[in-house]
C-alpha cells in the first residue's frame, strides 16, 4: 500500500460497459493508482472474468465483495461511488468514512435526480446546471448548496472516441443512448422512424457516410434494442 493511499472506489453493477467507464477515470487522472487503496467490486459471476482482466491490465488493486464481512476500510478515508446501487447504502452506513457520489455522467434523465443521492456526504456535479437540476428536482435545498453538500468540479468529461471534427466532412455520427435500467428511464431513440429521418437529413445535406456508436449498455435490460439497432443498420445499407 502506498503512502499516498487516500480513497476507495465501490462499484456494484452487472453491466460490463461500466468497467470501461471506470477505467477512463483512471486514464484521465481523475483517479490514480497511487491514491486509490482498492476498488471494491460487488461479485457477480457475469462480470468476474472481465473485472479481473480489466483491473489487472491497468494495475488497479481490487477486491471482490461477496458478503458484507469482506468489506474492510481504513478509518477516515474516502469512498467514491460511480453508480447508484442498493448495496451502496450498507457502505454509507459506515460513518467512519467520507462518502462521495461522483456519477459516471450527468444528464437531464431521471437517473440523475434519484432521491438516493441524498445519502452521500458529498455529491459531485460539473457546474451550475447540475446544481440547478438538483434544486428544481427537490433533491437538495439551497441550504444544502450553501453548506457545500454539492461540489462543482468543472468539466470532467472523460469520454473518448475515434471521431474528430472536419469542416468539409460529409459524415454524420449517430450515438443513441441505451434503454435505461427501468422502463421509466428509457430515452433510447433507436427506431425505424428515427432511421428514416436520419436518412432524409443526410440526403438533404449531401452527407455520404453515417457512423453509429451505440451506448455500451444497449440491450442490457431489453435485448430487443440490439435487434432494433441491427434493423436500422440494415436500413442504412
Named regions from a protein language model:
Residues 4-8, 149, 170-172:
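Residues that mark the start of a beta-strand
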Residues 10-20, 38-159:
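Active-site and donor-binding regions of nucleotide-sugar-utilizing enzymes
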Residues 65-71, 222-237:
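Donor nucleotide-activated moiety binding/catalytic core segment of transferases
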Residues 141-145, 203-205, 234-236:
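Short helix-capping segments at alpha-helix termini
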Amino acid at each position: 500500500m502506498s503512502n499516498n493511499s487516500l480513497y476507495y472506489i465501490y462499484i456494484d453493477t452487472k453491466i460490463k460497459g461500466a468497467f470501461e467507464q471506470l477505467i477512463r477515470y483512471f486514464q484521465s487522472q481523475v483517479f490514480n493508482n497511487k491514491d486509490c487503496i482498492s476498488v471494491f467490486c460487488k461479485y457477480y459471476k457475469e462480470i468476474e472474468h472481465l473485472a479481473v482482466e480489466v483491473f489487472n491490465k491497468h494495475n488497479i488493486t481490487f477486491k471482490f465483495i461477496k458478503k458484507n464481512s469482506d468489506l474492510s476500510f481504513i478509518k477516515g478515508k474516502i469512498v467514491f461511488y460511480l453508480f447508484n446501487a442498493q448495496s451502496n447504502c450498507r457502505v454509507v452506513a459506515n460513518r467512519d468514512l467520507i462518502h462521495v457520489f461522483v456519477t459516471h455522467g450527468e444528464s437531464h434523465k431521471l437517473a440523475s435526480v434519484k432521491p438516493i443521492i441524498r445519502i452521500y456526504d458529498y455529491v459531485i456535479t460539473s457546474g451550475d446546471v447540475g446544481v440547478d437540476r438538483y434544486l428544481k428536482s427537490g433533491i437538495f435545498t439551497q441550504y444544502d448548496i450553501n453548506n457545500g453538500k454539492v461540489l462543482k468540479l468543472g468539466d470532467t468529461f472523460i469520454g473518448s472516441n475515434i471521431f474528430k471534427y472536419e469542416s468539409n466532412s460529409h459524415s454524420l455520427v449517430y450515438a443513441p443512448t441505451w434503454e435505461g435500467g427501468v422502463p421509466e428511464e428509457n430515452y433510447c431513440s433507436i427506431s425505424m422512424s428515427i432511421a428514416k429521418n436520419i436518412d432524409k437529413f443526410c440526403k438533404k445535406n449531401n452527407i455520404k457516410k453515417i457512423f453509429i456508436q451505440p451506448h455500451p449498455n444497449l440491450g442490457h435490460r431489453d435485448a430487443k434494442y440490439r435487434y432494433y439497432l441491427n434493423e436500422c443498420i440494415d436500413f442504412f445499407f
